[in-house]
Amino acid sequence: MKLLRFLVLSPSGIKLDKTIISAQVKTTEGYIGLNFNRAPLIAAIQSHLCKIIFADQTKREAIIGAGLMLIKKTEAKIFTENFVFADEVDINETLKRKTELERKIHHIKDAKLNVKIEQNLMFELLKLSSKKK
């Protein structure tokens, strides 16, 4: 079985660089499966819970923030500011961050900044929902 190189990149660096069997990613058009030899694609992605099967058959879920995805036959890259594995989420830190973002969103009048805050709030809510499973 041929494997796909899966990278998650952010302004702060490489968040993930592993070979995978498959991953399920949510684009603005819906979920798509990633695996080796997939047709090339560039797509916007939404904040979502991504299911990944790694080359060693282990399965993990990750919360990925909104961003952009570039797929080639042998490689998939996701460009996002937010990425964390679901099993590494700190509930207390996430709740503090959520409260802070909710406070900010009510006081900011700048539409562009509000969109950014909404995206970050969505990411924090996904982190919390992943822990309720």
Swiss-Prot record:
Gene Ontology CC terms: plasma membrane; proton-transporting ATP synthase complex
Residue ranges of coiled coil: none
InterPro entries: ATP_synth_F1_dsu/esu (IPR001469), ATP_synth_F1_dsu/esu_N (IPR020546), ATPsynth_dsu/esu_N (IPR036771)
Record localization: Cell membrane
Its membrane topology: Peripheral membrane protein
Highest taxon of the lineage: Bacteria
SUPFAM superfamilies the record matches: Epsilon subunit of F1F0-ATP synthase N-terminal domain
One function term, GO molecular function aspect: ATP binding
Keyword list, A-Z: ATP synthesis, Cell membrane, CF(1), Hydrogen ion transport, Ion transport, Membrane, Transport
Subunit record text: F-type ATPases have 2 components, CF(1) - the catalytic core - and CF(0) - the membrane proton channel. CF(1) has five subunits: alpha(3), beta(3), gamma(1), delta(1), epsilon(1). CF(0) has three main subunits: a, b and c.
NCBIfam families on file: PRK00539.1
Function: Produces ATP from ADP in the presence of a proton gradient across the membrane.
Similarity-based family: Belongs to the ATPase epsilon chain family.
Name of the protein: ATP synthase epsilon chain
The species this protein was found in: Mycoplasma genitalium (strain ATCC 33530 / DSM 19775 / NCTC 10195 / G37) (Mycoplasmoides genitalium)
